Amino acid sequence: MKFLKLIPILFIFFGNVPYKNEVHAEIKNPEDFRVLSNEIKKLSISNVEYFIKEGDNYIKNGDFEKAKEFYLDARKLAKQLASFYSDLNSSFKGIDARIPKEMQRKGKETLQILAEVNERLASMYIKTEKPEVAVPLLVETIRIMSPNSPEGKEAYERLIQLGFVETKYKG
């Protein structure tokens, strides 16, 4: 019976003995380990900006379908990022004030770029005579940026031009 009590002690003792074939990970630059902080970021605002830039290039060349694909990719990624930042902001409230501040800053930046993508998509849909598809994008811009922001005011003005709303906003 006493022998059974010694077994955990033996495991602890022999478990801490270094092994001959032990391999240690070596990282010369700690920043290389942070995959999403590198230049080639898939899940980042810079990637959203890349999609927008590519869409703009296709608009200049008159290829609206390709531009739409890039703008929709930018919009999808921006919405994902905004959702992730919002979730992290909520999760850390009351625990560590630094993290919600960072997430709020990044979230605002993401919503700003989402409004930019929505504006470009709405313009493209209006130009290709599909204003019914532009309306939800303009309404979303007003919702995420507020009617008092320059983006919100511009989106509401576009809704007036489309005939979706009639009352002028004096804000």
Could you tell me what each predicted segment is?
Residues 69-99, 140-157:
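Short, charge-rich amphipathic alpha-helical segments embedded
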Residues 27-28, 92-109, 160-171:
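Alpha-helical linker/edge segments of TPR/alpha-solenoid repeat scaffolds
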Residues 46, 106-113, 151:
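Structural signature of alpha-solenoid helical repeat junctions
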